[in-house]
Amino acid sequence: MGEALTKEEIDDLADRWYKALDVHAPVEELHAMLLDEGNEMMWPEGPTHGHKEFTGWYDRVTRIFFDEVHTLTKVDSKIDGESADVEVVVNWQAKVWNPPEPNSKWLGFDAYQTWEVVRSPDTGQAVIKRYVVDKLDPMPGSTEL
């Protein structure tokens, strides 16, 4: 049995995850925060499993959304040893441009998510095993997804 996860590790993981998404970090930086085998991500666009499918999703969305800002408003962890169920709420704002429209459009949502975080068998670090976008609440004036 390995070391139990801590709230601080999970908070740090969530913070690093959204900072990487904001800057469209190289996908390898995000892979380091995700379990590969056994990983499941439930996006509004559809599910991904493992690093390979995540990379396909990431390549698509980083070519659609820009000027992204993710602001964490809640990270509530229920830790059980080397795994944790985590409620995450993040305010996500971005722009999208649909050619040949003359202007980009603003998007703003509060995203309610559920994560399962585990300790990586390879690195010993806290990583995301399962990531579910439960609900997107649009902000006033937001374009629809």
Identify the residue ranges that each predicted region occupies.
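A short hydrophobic beta-strand element
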Residues: 80-97, 111
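Short, low-complexity N-terminal intrinsically disordered segments enriched in polar/charged residues
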Residues: 1-37
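Short, cysteine-centered beta-strand-loop-beta hairpins and adjacent loop/turn segments enriched
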Residues: 63-67, 92-107, 137-142
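Short beta-strand segments enriched in hydrophobic/aromatic residues
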Residues: 34, 90-94, 132-135
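A solvent-exposed, acidic/Ser-Thr-rich amphipathic alpha-helical stretch
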Residues: 27-81
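A broad structural signal for short, well-ordered beta-strand segments within beta-sheet-rich domains
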Residues: 9, 65-67, 72-74, 125-133
